[in-house]
């Protein structure tokens, strides 16, 4: 099988993003239509549902990076205080042939990092304070190169949209559970032995069980191969696979989970923020395998 060019990979990521948005819109409409039917909202409910889906898709596409950054408490990195970090980001971005992304900091002891945005002109890189404290310049450069690779390969749009959508799925689960117990509205089936309420209870229970699985499946849709590709691309950008390999080794040895994160955003990070190895639906390859592949690269 022939290798894909960078432009083919970028185009594929954009297509997958649009396909994901369309698929999710259909699922969301099906769930929303049940609420419209159950609470007897009629045509008004359908119109409001359609407006909500369009608005949410716009937010997911245009504002997902801001949502992702805000959800983890990231703040802009002061150029004077974090001069070395800004310098490394600028150097790596120049070597990768993309504009310098915005630079953010997370007050977090776990060494980690992620990139977000919709394209290379509207992108951000965020690192934890723990990463800055633990890494030397070569290791930090390797981590930044990995994240810059996600930007250059246009992984970031799909990854960030998935994070926002996964967050909505979790929210829908909570709304479904609350509506089950609070019994909001009047069902058109209430006259018939509360059949509507029973149906909602059953659907709510099912959805509350499968919602976390949906989140895991969505996260795993972000192929593990993207991480391998970003590792390799980053190594070639800075002409050094050992900096990132050493950084991953230190990251892998840190097992304490991150204080502020969620299942919705876990796949964005360079390493699993929960500080544990996941086998089923894992979005990150084993760190040991990533290190092995990096050390086998020839520059």
Curated annotation (Swiss-Prot):
It holds the Pfam family Peptidase_M48. One of its GO terms (molecular function) is metalloendopeptidase activity. Keywords: Cell membrane, Hydrolase, Membrane, Metal-binding, Metalloprotease, Protease, Transmembrane, Transmembrane helix, Zinc. It is found in: Cell membrane. It comes from the Bacteria. The active site is at 147. Binds 1 zinc ion per subunit. It is an enzyme of class 3 (hydrolase). One of its GO terms (cellular component) is plasma membrane. Signal peptide: none annotated. Its cofactor is Zn(2+). The chain crosses the membrane at residues 19-39, 41-61, 156-176, 198-218. InterPro entries: HtpX_protease, Pept_M48_protease_HtpX, Peptidase_M48. It is a multi-pass membrane protein. Zn(2+) binds at residues 146, 150, 227. GO terms for biological process: proteolysis. Disulfide bonds: none annotated. Its EC number is 3.4.24.-. Belongs to the peptidase M48B family. This is Protease HtpX homolog. It comes from Thermoanaerobacter sp. (strain X514).
């Amino acid at each position: 099988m022939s290798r894909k060019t960078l432009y083919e990979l970028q185009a594929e990521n954009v297509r997958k993003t649009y396909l994901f948005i369309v698929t999710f819109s259909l699922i969301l409409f099906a769930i929303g239509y049940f609420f419209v039917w159950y609470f007897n909202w009629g045509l008004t409910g359908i119109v409001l549902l359609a407006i909500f889906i369009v608005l949410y898709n716009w937010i997911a596409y245009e504002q997902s990076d801001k949502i992702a950054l805000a959800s983890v408490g990231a703040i802009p990195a002061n150029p004077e205080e974090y001069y070395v970090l800004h310098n490394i980001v600028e150097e790596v971005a120049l070597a990768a042939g993309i504009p310098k992304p915005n630079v953010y900091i997370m007050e977090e002891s776990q060494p980690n990092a992620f990139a977000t945005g919709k394209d290379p002109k509207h992108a951000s890189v965020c690192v934890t304070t723990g990463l800055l404290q633990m890494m030397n310049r070569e290791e930090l450069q390797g981590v930044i190169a990995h994240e810059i690779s996600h930007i250059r390969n246009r992984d970031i749009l799909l990854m960030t949209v998935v994070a926002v959508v996964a967050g909505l799925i979790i929210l829908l689960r909570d709304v479904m559970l609350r509506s089950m117990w609070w019994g909001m509205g009047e069902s058109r089936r209430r006259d018939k032995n509360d059949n509507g309420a029973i149906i909602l209870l059953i659907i709510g229970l099912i959805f509350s069980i499968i919602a976390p699985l949906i989140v895991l499946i969505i996260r795993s849709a972000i192929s593990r191969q993207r991480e391998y590709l970003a590792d390799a691309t980053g190594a070639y950008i800075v002409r050094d696979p050992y900096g990132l390999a050493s950084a991953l080794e230190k990251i892998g040895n840190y097992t304490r989970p991150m204080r502020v994160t969620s299942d919705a955003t876990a796949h964005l990070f360079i390493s699993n923020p929960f500080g544990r190895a996941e086998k089923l639906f894992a979005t990150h390859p084993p760190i040991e395998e990533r290190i092995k592949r990096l050390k086998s690269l020839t520059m």
